[in-house]
Amino acid sequence: MRKRIGILTSGGDCPGLNCVIRAVVSHATLTYDWEVLGIPYATQGLRERQAIALNMHGWDLRGIDPLLNMGGTILGTINKGDTLAHVDEMLASYQALALDALIVIGGDGSLGILHELASRGNWNLVAIPKTIDNDVALTERAVGFDTAVNTIVDALNRLTFTAASHDRVMIVEVMGRSAGHLALHAGIAGGADVILIPEISYTISGLCQHIAELRDRWQRKFAIVVVAEGAKLCLEDVQENIASSCAPSKCGRGQYIADQIAQCSKNLIDTRVSVLGHIQRGGIPSALDRLTATVFGKTAVDLIAQGKFGQMVAWQNGEAIPVPIQDVVAQSPLHVNPQGSLVQSARCLGIYVGEKT
């Protein structure tokens, strides 16, 4: 009997989602002659029983080709709302759509919610990791991360020249509330002088001392500071600055650091803040993200054909392999290892990455 599978994108968007959709539709159609339904706007579309036949109505194999270099997701996505408040509706929708299996492309939050729904409804679920934060456990790589790193590095390349021209300290705030993979990778690749991440606490004195040393010892009158939005102060500094008019929670991590540098230097150091924001989520997917998305999409279809459900496609040791979704959810988010090779490499290059423990 011909299978009917569904596919949805959930959570924040990122480059490479359309590449996954392209791979799933192409492989499912060419190899297995399955029907593929795209479910718009994640669990909202599932609850409302919306579905788009991706191998019909203009989405033939020739028409899918442009998806390879298209950012965002043609299916739309949401990252808000209380999904579990509509459990019964969504459980009924899976049956009403007559799905034999569902492919979910999401981050750790989405995977947790969809895994819970699948467990309650006995769905046949296969997951694909996507996140610019790269914080999904048990996989070395997630769709969207590489492009986001490249986007930040491009911004750092541009900002370095304007910082040098004006002898400024440029603070670049990037995404990463609980994990600093994005800031760490982009900061090292982009030649940052300071990288602040959630996993390693920093002090105002340590930060200011490092910038002063760049000027006094190395005659570097400019500096590039990359800070994750979830970077954490040491406890002593938190207590001292809790009443500050520009605490991180009030005006943003980047602006807070700029104000502290100005205060330490008695306003002798000129600072500027650049919050990259959602530009990190956009753009044409990189070659690596296209390859990752394609292999992940193909592997997800094969897992369905093999009857291997409750699995997420992961990248480990150069191969795409299945790992149990429940293990991924239990071990996520994946944090930066403070003693890992990336942190140690950054420190050996003279980059301030917070205080050593």
Swiss-Prot record:
Mg(2+) binds at residue 108. InterPro entries: ATP_PFK, ATP_PFK_prok-type, Phosphofructokinase_CS, Phosphofructokinase_dom, Phosphofructokinase_III, PKF_sf. The active site is at residue 133. Pathway: Carbohydrate degradation; glycolysis; D-glyceraldehyde 3-phosphate and glycerone phosphate from D-glucose: step 3/4. One of its GO terms (biological process) is canonical glycolysis. Belongs to the phosphofructokinase type A (PFKA) family. Mixed-substrate PFK group III subfamily. This is ATP-dependent 6-phosphofructokinase 2. The gene is pfkA2.
